Amino acid sequence: MIFMGSTETVLSVLVLVLLGYILKVLGVLGEEDASTLNRVVINVAIPSLIFTSLYRADLSGISDLVLIPVICMITGTLSGTIAYLWARRRGLDSGKTWGLTVAAAMMNSGFLGYPVTAGIFGSEGLVRAIFYDTGTTLMFTSLGLLLSHISGGEGSRIMKRAVFFPPLWAFLLGVIFNLWGLPTGIAGTILGYLSGAAVPLIMISLGLTLNFRFLRHSVADATLVSGLRLLISPLMAAGISYVLAFRGLNFSVTVLEASMPSAMLAAVLAIENDLDVDLVSSCIFMSTILSLVSLPLWSVVL
């Protein structure tokens, strides 16, 4: 990807998101089309991007990189715990309580994190973002199993989804092919073409999902989650990274990824576990909109 300044990067992201929203308003695409685009992104485009990036990367410092998903899980757990305690203090029901928890704990480190990080820090930054996003995948699996246990359901569906999650396999294969120096042949060229579709499809899909109608009933809760995701989480990540002696690009990418808004996967957990889907959608929407302001500020600081 071409290295760009932070302002140009976020502006490009905003334009692509708005393009998706405008296409929905004009009736060219519907909100239901987002699920189709998401399937293409998750099963084809993002795995291609992950494999290609890792295959071409310098992984000589992989011992430091493996700490990045650990920081992701720590900051996510702390943010989710704060949201859980807030909800309990307010006496919210279980659906709202756990809805706030998953929205605060899971960040959009892939769908939004990849293009923003790659645009600001280049291909080496993208590699670190991929490692960070692995932590989000582990958070998704852990929360899914926890919620299944609480609701008395079976965790096998979540575990199966995690085991067969295409981005996870792309991550593992990318690292293996890189470290062992395995050739990719024509497959490498094909994956390179497919990886180029990831960013525009991600942003257009995100624009299709923007919906204002849920927000008016959940402003206070969505504001709390947005504050946790966009401000508190990156500050916690900065503190943990400093303690672990992270410096330079490792530090910058880890903090930037921690400042991403609530993940779209939080809505998946809400739907599958009968949580308050409207509340989770409000948190995703507000934090995503506000991140268009906060991300340029964090990129300047970093």
Swiss-Prot record:
Pfam families in alphabetical order: Mem_trans (PF03547)
Q: Which GO terms describe its biological process?
A: transmembrane transport
Q: Transmembrane region positions?
A: 10-30, 65-85, 102-122, 130-150, 162-182, 190-210, 224-244, 251-271, 282-302
**What's the main place this protein lives?**
membrane
User: What keywords tag this UniProt record?
Assistant: Cell membrane, Membrane, Transmembrane, Transmembrane helix, Transport
Provide one Gene Ontology cellular component: plasma membrane
Report the subcellular localization: Cell membrane
Q: Which domain of life is it from?
A: Archaea
Q: Which topology term describes how it sits in the membrane?
A: Multi-pass membrane protein
What family, per the record? Belongs to the auxin efflux carrier (TC 2.A.69) family.
Protein name per UniProt = Uncharacterized transporter MTH_1382
> What organism does the UniProt record list as the source?
Methanothermobacter thermautotrophicus (strain ATCC 29096 / DSM 1053 / JCM 10044 / NBRC 100330 / Delta H) (Methanobacterium thermoautotrophicum)
